[in-house]
Amino acid sequence: DQHSQFSGICNPKGRLLASFRVFHCGDSYYLCLPSSMIETVISRLRRFMLRSKVTLEEASDTFVHLGVSGSEAEQALRNVAGTLPDNIHEVTQNKDQAIIRVPGIHPSFEIFTTTEQARQLWSSLNVQSAPVGSIAWQFLDIQAGIPMIFPETREAFVPQMANLQLIDGVSFTKGCYTGQEIVARMQYLGKLKRRMYRARCESTTQPLAGDEVYVSGEGTQSVGKLVSAAPHPDGGYSMLAVLQISSAEGKSRLHLGSASGAVITLEHLPYPFPSE
């Protein structure tokens, strides 16, 4: 009850169908993921219910979902919500509210609560905090190197390509799960040729999940794919992209959409790659 888990679900070939955060509240487990992925996950999980005494349903109307982040976020939230989780992924909760501490460049919390409590929190936090849209939270996920799978990237990556092994998002010791053989083989026997990088781009149009990445002078052969993208407060766009390691760490420029598209500049993730 005091721990959440960032995770994913794979197809038999070990490719990610979705990524999400799992937490327990009351007598249920909840998965937090993009609304566009709900039907995919429900349809997949229903295959494994068999005769189990389990119900599976969309829970979008169960909670109001809020995010609070910033250098003063912890104290501001503590003043109105009381006890907060101390460590990343930990959860504090009562019968109808859960607060999860999540990775971020600043202290960051996700809150799942009732409509009435959400109104009270919003009113109290709005005194010193600035309300922003969900796209701003997507930017924070990108800065933290947290990959969310969307319909455009469904089944495009094995977990290691999206860095799940670096953010405690995949287990190599637990029991069977779909695609486990492929995922384990990649971890212990394979050589990873693609992984996820954080990047910046001054594109004149909004980059989208699934957009292709190219290298200068290499024609129409894509070397990677965007995982997610969001406007950067200082202009341009911040992105996560799964790229060929050889291309990302080579000397040629990376471009969005075509070999002559907007230039992509790589940035450091907040966690190291194993070789670093």
Q: Can you annotate each of these PLM segments?
A:
Residues 59, 102, 145, 175, ...:
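Residue-level recognition of beta-strand microenvironments
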Residues 1-19, 23:
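Acidic, proline/glycine-enriched N-terminal capping motif
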Residues 162-170, 184-276:
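Glycine-rich, small/acidic residue-mixed loop/short-helix segments
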Residues 110-200:
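Anionic-ligand-binding alpha/beta catalytic cores of soluble enzymes and soluble regulatory domains
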Residues 28, 63, 108, 181, ...:
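Intrinsic-disorder/low-complexity, polar/charged segments enriched in Ser/Thr/Lys/Arg/Asp/Glu/Gln
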Residues 2-3, 84-92, 206-212, 251:
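Glycine-centered loop/turn motifs
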Residues 21-144:
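Acidic, low-complexity central loop/insert segments
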